Amino acid sequence: MASLRDIKAKINSTKKTSQITKAMEMVSASKLNRAEQNAKSFVPYMEKIQEVVASIAQGSKGINHPMLTARPVKRTGYIVITSDRGLAGGYNSNVLREVSKVIRERHNMDPNQYSIIVLGRLGRDYLKRRGFNIIDEVVGLSDHPSFTDIKDLASRAIAMFADGAYDELYIYYNHYVSKISQEVTENKVLPLTDVKSDKKLTPYEFEPSEEEILKVLLPQYAESLVYGALLDGKASEHAARMTAMKSATDNAMEVIDTLTLSFNRARQAAITQEITEIVGGAAALE
């Protein structure tokens, strides 16, 4: 049986750990509130640009743009959103497991058939160690990234599609459902063959022309899909970390309760032993 000193040291150590996890939980909760606001505030822009693109794509005939046209798929691009830091439960492992499975099933790990653009240090390290074909990466993103932080990467990804580096582009990330639920999600970014708006389409008059508008608007729309997924993923990351730290704190409190019970029992046993020895010694002197 562990000594009273050992049990007491374990209790103190666990208390200190619980203080750390509680602080991390509170920090993550604060970051989550802001991340939720960022994601929600981006929705109106996404909906409006989607409405305009859908109005052109569905309301006009003869519109021909490479980003709207499907072509034979010889190579597929993947954007994978992960985090730079751990302690977030299954946030990273879930999306990386899904991406790994998809690439093995679709491409049999043939680097000539796929390429990966990865966001986040943990995702980069995981995929590199396992020999996946990474062609671009971004690490060190802010907890609350701006569009500027991701624009260069998104522009490169779109340019590679236009140049034929791959024939379709998907993005994988954790979609934020609630504080306790996040879902691994696959969205097709390019080509934009299924652009639809949930709202009733408003008729627009375009100047100088629909084709010229699309040249500017389609890359912006594709970039906004990437940025929207990043904001969604950041909210999921903070929610997952908050939940993980709450679970760790709760587990620590259970351990403390168990250790305290063991400490009290050991202390009671020690006192009983001392009393027995004193009584026995007194009886021997009589």
UniProtKB/Swiss-Prot annotation:
Any one GO cellular component localisation term in the record: plasma membrane
GO-annotated biological processes: proton motive force-driven plasma membrane ATP synthesis
Pfam families: ATP-synt
Location, primary (coarse class): membrane
Protein localization: Cell membrane
Family, per entry: Belongs to the ATPase gamma chain family.
Quaternary organization: F-type ATPases have 2 components, CF(1) - the catalytic core - and CF(0) - the membrane proton channel. CF(1) has five subunits: alpha(3), beta(3), gamma(1), delta(1), epsilon(1). CF(0) has three main subunits: a, b and c.
Name of the protein described by the UniProt record: ATP synthase gamma chain
Gene that produces this protein: atpG
